[in-house]
Amino acid sequence: MGAQVSTQKTGAHETLLEAAQGATINYTNINYYKDAASNSANRQDFSQDPSKFTEPVKDIMIKSMPALNSPSAEECGYSDRVRSITLGNSTITTQESANVVVAYGRWPKYLEDDQATAEDQPTQPDVATCRFYTLESVQWEANSAGWWWKFPEALKDMGLFGQNMYYHYLGRAGYTIHVQCNASKFHQGCLLVVCVPEAEMGCAKPDENVDATNLTNGENTCELTAGAAPAEKGKVQTAVCNATMGVAVGNLTIFPHQWINLRTNNCATIVMPYINSVPMDNMFRHYNFTLMVIPFVPLTSMGGSTYVPITVTIAPMCAEYNGLRLSTQHQGLPVMNVPGSNQFLTSDNFQSPCAMPEYDVTPPLDIPGEVNNLMEVAEVDSVVPVNNLSDNVKTIKAYQIPVSAGDSSRPEAVFKFQLDPGSGSVLKHTLLGEIINYYAHWSGSIKLTFVFCGSAMATGKLLIAYSPPGASAPATRKDAMLGTHIIWDLGLQSSCVLCVPWISQTHYRMVERDEYTTAGYISCWYQTNIIVPPDTPSQCYMLCLASACNDFSVRMLKDTPFIQQEAKLQGEPGKAIESAISRVADTISSGPTNSEQVPALTAAETGHTSQVVPGDTIQTRHVKNYHSRSESTIENFLCRSACVHIARYEAGANASNEDRFVRWEINNKELVQLRRKCEMFTYLRYDVEVTFVITSQQDQGTDLSQDMPVLTHQVMYVPPGGSVTKQGDSYAWQTSTNPSVFWTEGNAPPRMSIPFISIGNAYSSFYDGWSHFSQKGVYGYNTLNKMGTLFVRHVNKETPKPVTSTVRVYFKPKHIRAWIPRPPRLCPYKYKANVNFDVTAITDSRLTITTVPQVEHNLRTA
């Protein structure tokens, strides 16, 4: 029996079945193959929970209440945002906190019985190990680019925690990270404190691999650099603009983070659960996450201390260990007799036979941070490179918006940019821009959060405006205030949100630049001057963060224009609350207000994304929204057949043994479009449907006669560890166990499904660790991603004429689960075996911070 209403959509047509007056709807589900991996993809799953990424805070934050609450203390010039954290026999107190981020909404916990694999009783030292440890301090100066520490490696010499690391084979732990940075009210600057799971880093010399000594220095820090690192063997590419991983540094906010804005707070606190694709791991060779501290606004003071110390204090939580040992050294196929029955459509959704019947897959693991829909990621704030001048696009300065104090009138704009999230140089490489560039159309409201990073003594008012399309960008403040605008009074709440409402004559706008559906302009103006007392920096900075509102949707999936490939990559590698949402949110009618509630003011330092909607800042009408987020589900995003390998093999009297067959170790790293999509998530679990498109040609020669027989091809799948054939006519091809597909030319392309093969609980897109226990061998390589090997040959031993066949292997992941979203790759790929990269500009440049594309609106008469 089914639901009362059943709806099926195909293209622009909709079929509706409704049960009334006691009637029922009966469903028939035909599975032609008994194995779950053979089933077609799951398409209709609308469950979403963006809050684990947008609001991962310990204390519930109410939109209408101030994010930082200290009205009485603000009058005295001091904050009363006190917090005390006790773990073991150690306590930390602070009077300048900005809430606590609980990464992915998960508090650390011990391993559950139904998740465990090791059978020996675990060591759980509790208070002897789970206490605060303080690492070596670093000095923040005006030219500092940033620092990183890798965990648990940074604690290897810290008390009993380090001893247990050495004397146990396996371990796991969560962590409380507390980063402290004390400065006076006359200092200014802003730090991003972020925890990056599986921060696999690239080498400064792309054709080499990094050394362990350059990846981590124990409790001492490793430093980022403002520009590209020297191309030396074993060195990490430390250019801060690409965050050591080939991504835009402004998109690191997809990970658990807080900001230390010296005018607002002096510490950041992040609680990290254990994150991995297996229940436990060797703590010496695998760095589960990396703590990065990056100055987005430089430290500035006038006559005071020229540097400020930054101290990291970290406490393991729920630590447990296993494997005590010696210490280590340092039925038939469906038939459709209709046109199209023998074609291969890369987006089809049919069943295919399973290559491994009765296969017993490993059970899923409860990994924090599961993603169901790309809009969950689009709703997370990321930093916008508003200051993308040519000199800045390869530095952190691209994110710094200068505002300065002055003794005279300031009629000029602070900044302007075109609201073009798909193709505009300012927004296209944010998290929002990267995601919508996988689609042709977008619709919905956009949040822009501005963070003032001047000293606590600086005051002033700014006007931030959205000017709808139809005219040129505003030339004066008078022009700007005619549009949707907000006047921001700088105060304790460091951040102000401009919610750009959806104002359009069409349901969607084009992602590609299009004047008919252009979205308008954003500009900022001095409402009053910025005022500072003596001995206080007069040059201040702002940051801008962008994200989607809950009415945002996309459609018409396509390839992104941000990654290209000319040749195959080389280099071999050695539960949160869910809500079922089928439509985006409606716009609720709102009227004028005069209230002490300030939803537009917030504090980005807390690490949460504001939940402001258009009705909080403008009067709105009720709009019934029928757009859905079905196309942005993870299943739909990844469930398209993509070419992952191309190879040639020959038949004929002159063909050598090596040329008579193809051997390919299955991976998705050679061709960049699918690789980039998969690398937007740290861990993936899926079955894969493999389709083989084989074409043959008769080789050129002096004989002009054509005598091409109908060729039969054999595709053999060998599981990991299976015997490998070295000849095209070996008896290994006459296997009794390895599954083979025999295909004769002229038929529909052969296809098989391969279930989830890994010995772990998920495939790892990145692995910040080593293949050997001694931190030697291959960096970034483990065996969890082994999926087996494919062999292809001609069954015909000889042919009258030399024949060359080309096989194209198409992958379609299905039954997909994804965890821990990541910033999309910015830098071009170099090799398939690592993440090495050349330093790449954050985005395209423009002439000045107020330069916008000029559009002519003259009436054409010709």
Curated annotation (Swiss-Prot):
One of its GO terms (molecular function) is structural molecule activity. SUPFAM superfamilies: Positive stranded ssRNA viruses. Keywords: Autocatalytic cleavage, Capsid protein, Eukaryotic host gene expression shutoff by virus, Eukaryotic host translation shutoff by virus, Host cytoplasm, Host gene expression shutoff by virus, Host-virus interaction, Lipoprotein, Magnesium, Myristate, Pore-mediated penetration of viral genome into host cell, Viral attachment to host cell, Viral penetration into host cytoplasm, Virion, Virus entry into host cell. The keyword Ribonucleoprotein does not apply. The record marks N69, S70, Q331, G332 as: Cleavage. GO terms for biological process: symbiont genome entry into host cell via pore formation in plasma membrane; symbiont-mediated suppression of host gene expression; virion attachment to host cell. This is Genome polyprotein. It comes from Echovirus 16 (strain Harrington).
